[in-house]
């Protein structure tokens, strides 16, 4: 398994599993014609890259000319705009958990940083692995790096060890020799970024000094390299994690506004520094990390793209793991409801504010991660994501840690996903009209969302209606990963994909049973909120009381912690709280069949937070008022 330590939205990641497909873009303008001609010429045997990459056991510096493409090729890339570059970058993959595998402590104890890349379970990178990724349909590779793996920064020495620098350069050369676009960054790197949030000005100054020194060395080393090499200002650290405490020992003091200001400052310093180094860095494409690399936070007006002396050479980086419970946990196994599509389509449309301003956008990480093979509906998730990338000019870069692409054998883990990658490689789309690609993508997005809506409607036994009283279980797991129609408005479409509900129509007095089955989407962990709801209950059956007779959890009788009562918050929906932590006192208007509110509680089903729940069944009695 691949181990690392990095947070996502304040969630500590320990393992990354993944696999997915990506989509290509098409170059327009005269630059496209030039590049196409160069590519055709390259088929005649010209590798397009001068120099030979270092062997895996080499620690000496690679040739200064390694990775440089032909002059015509470079001129074509140099002439591209940001959006044209994104289309040329096509479909990408991360070399995950490899050169960012953190072992700074080992370096301080005298270990050779050249060997750290296997520390998180990945094999030592070879040219064959990288070429295999290219052959699998990936045109871009992102190489995360932990540069302090070769640095004594605690002593104020920010010199990057030559052995680490040389190893990174060797892997970059592998990728350039495979005719791939290459992204290099500083990736988590032990959390040193938290120095920017220190209450001590001296520590903050050291952080900026180290950042500048790091990128000066990287920039100088690669200043003559191909324009296919892209520098990325950070990973996910420019945002809330500027207050991380791994290195400083205490949480930072920056408030939200100050975090935005500091992130903007770092990005600005990054651009100015790289441009000042000259060579190809004067107009190299630079990838600017968004705030937390989160779409919503990056679209906040407080985030600013930096100014640049080069024309249309800035790209924006964000990551996409939404919904987190499906993408990164085992609690949710399905994706594809109308609300899932609405959420994904809405966020990608929101992000288009940057492409509309002329900035190419890189989805620097995305994946559906699982411990056991490929999750159900992964193909739906990826296909729709890639269609959005085509529609809005984004370059998607799969997060992969030897999960989809098996580096040791140069094979892929799933034929269906592999075919999606291959079918969308740049080679298959480079001759198509850009607007035609966008139009086709939009049609697929709309058709897919419509089909999902129709399929869901067909599966609902009792759709909402003002003429019926429908009983159902409102439910949200403790981690909110699994839910079903929470709130006083009965909405059977508002649920985690895969939840099966056994709802009933109330027709008068009698005993009824409602249920929820989570087994097809995972297991719920405890409950943050749950209640029995009866839509239109107060209108169609005014004054009725509903008494919980029995609760079954996974088929076993659950001993209730109190007595149930009937109430309503809106005068329309009747509710019987099962677990409502926001209600500590029984409301005076509450009612029971026997008229006695003694021992009544809004928390009669108090499940442990981590208890796994597969099924819930509630049997209750409806009684008319006397």
What are these regions, as identified by a protein language model?
Residues 38-42:
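C-terminal motif of bacterial Sec signal peptides marking the signal peptidase cleavage site
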Residues 43-54:
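Bacterial lipoprotein signal-peptidase II cleavage site
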Residues 58-140:
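N-terminal carbohydrate-binding accessory modules
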Residues 120-141, 151, 156-188, 192-233, ...:
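An active-site-proximal structural segment forming one wall of the substrate-binding cleft
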Residues 124-146, 347-354, 388, 395:
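Catalytic domains of carbohydrate-active enzymes, especially glycoside hydrolases
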Residues 205-332, 348-369, 391-394:
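Active-site region of glycoside hydrolase catalytic domains
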Residues 373-465:
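Aromatic-rich peripheral "rim/lid" segments of glycoside hydrolase catalytic domains that contact
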Residues 514-543, 592-603, 613:
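Extracellular beta-strand ligand-recognition surfaces/modules
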């Amino acid at each position: 398994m691949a181990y690392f330590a990095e947070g996502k939205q304040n969630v500590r990641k320990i393992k990354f599993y993944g696999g997915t497909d990506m989509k290509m873009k098409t170059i327009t303008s005269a630059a496209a014609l030039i590049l196409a001609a160069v590519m055709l010429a390259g088929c005649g045997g010209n590798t397009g890259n001068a120099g030979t990459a270092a062997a895996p056991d080499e620690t000496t510096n690679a040739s200064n000319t390694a990775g440089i493409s032909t002059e015509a090729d470079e001129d074509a890339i140099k002439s591209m705009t940001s959006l044209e570059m994104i289309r040329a970058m096509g479909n990408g993959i991360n070399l995950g958990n490899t050169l960012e595998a953190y072992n700074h402590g080992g370096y301080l104890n005298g270990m050779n940083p050249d060997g750290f890349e296997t520390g998180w379970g990945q094999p030592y990178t070879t040219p064959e692995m990288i070429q295999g990724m290219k052959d699998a349909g990936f045109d871009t590779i992102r190489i995360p790096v932990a540069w302090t793996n070769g640095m004594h920064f605690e002593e104020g020495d920010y010199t990057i060890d030559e052995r680490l620098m040389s190893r990174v350069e060797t892997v970059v050369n592998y990728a350039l020799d495979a005719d791939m676009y290459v992204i290099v960054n500083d990736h988590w790197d032990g959390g040193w970024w938290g120095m920017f949030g220190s209450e001590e000005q001296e520590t903050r100054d050291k952080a900026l000094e180290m950042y500048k020194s790091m990128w000066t060395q990287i920039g100088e080393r690669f200043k003559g390299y191909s324009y296919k090499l892209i520098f990325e200002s950070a990973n996910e650290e420019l945002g809330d994690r500027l207050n991380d405490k791994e290195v400083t020992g205490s949480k930072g003091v920056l408030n939200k506004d100050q975090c935005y200001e500091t992130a903007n400052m770092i990005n600005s310093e990054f651009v100015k520094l790289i441009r000042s180094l000259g060579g190809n860095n004067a107009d190299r494409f630079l990838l600017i990390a968004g705030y937390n690399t989160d779409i919503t936070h990056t679209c906040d007006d407080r985030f600013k793209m930096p100014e640049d002396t080069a024309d249309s050479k800035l790209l924006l980086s964000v990551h996409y793991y939404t919904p987190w419970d499906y993408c990164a946990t085992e609690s949710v196994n399905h994706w594809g409801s109308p609300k899932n599509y609405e959420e994904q389509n809405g966020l990608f449309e929101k992000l288009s504010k940057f492409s509309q301003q002329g900035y190419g956008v890189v989805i620097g990480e995305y994946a559906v991660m699982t411990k056991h093979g490929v999750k159900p509906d992964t193909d739906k998730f990826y296909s729709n994501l890639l269609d959005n990338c085509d529609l809005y000019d984004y370059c998607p870069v799969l997060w992969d840690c030897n999960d989809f692409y098996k580096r040791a054998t140069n094979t892929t883990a799933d034929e269906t996903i592999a075919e999606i990658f291959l079918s969308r490689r740049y080679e298959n789309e480079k001759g198509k009209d850009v607007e035609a690609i966008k139009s086709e993508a939009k049609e697929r997005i709309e058709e897919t969302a419509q089909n999902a809506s129709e399929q869901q409607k067909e599966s609902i036994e009792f759709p909402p209606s003002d003429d019926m009283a429908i009983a159902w279980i409102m439910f949200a797991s403790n981690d909110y990963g699994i839910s079903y129609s929470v709130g006083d408005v009965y909405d059977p479409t508002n649920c985690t994909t895969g939840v099966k509900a056994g709802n009933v129509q109330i027709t008068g007095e009698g005993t009824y049973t409602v249920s929820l089955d989570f087994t097809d989407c995972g297991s719920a962990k405890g409950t943050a909120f749950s209640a029995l709801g009866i839509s239109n209950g107060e209108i169609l059956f005014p004054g009725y009381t509903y008494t919980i007779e029995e609760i079954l959890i996974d088929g076993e009788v659950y001993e209730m912690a109190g007595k149930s009562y009937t109430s309503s918050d809106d005068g329309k929906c009747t509710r019987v709280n099962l677990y409502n932590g926001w209600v500590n006192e029984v409301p005076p208007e509450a009612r029971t069949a026997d008229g006695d509110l003694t021992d009544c509680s809004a928390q009669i089903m108090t499940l442990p937070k981590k208890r796994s729940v597969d099924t819930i069944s509630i049997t209750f009695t409806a009684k008319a008022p006397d």
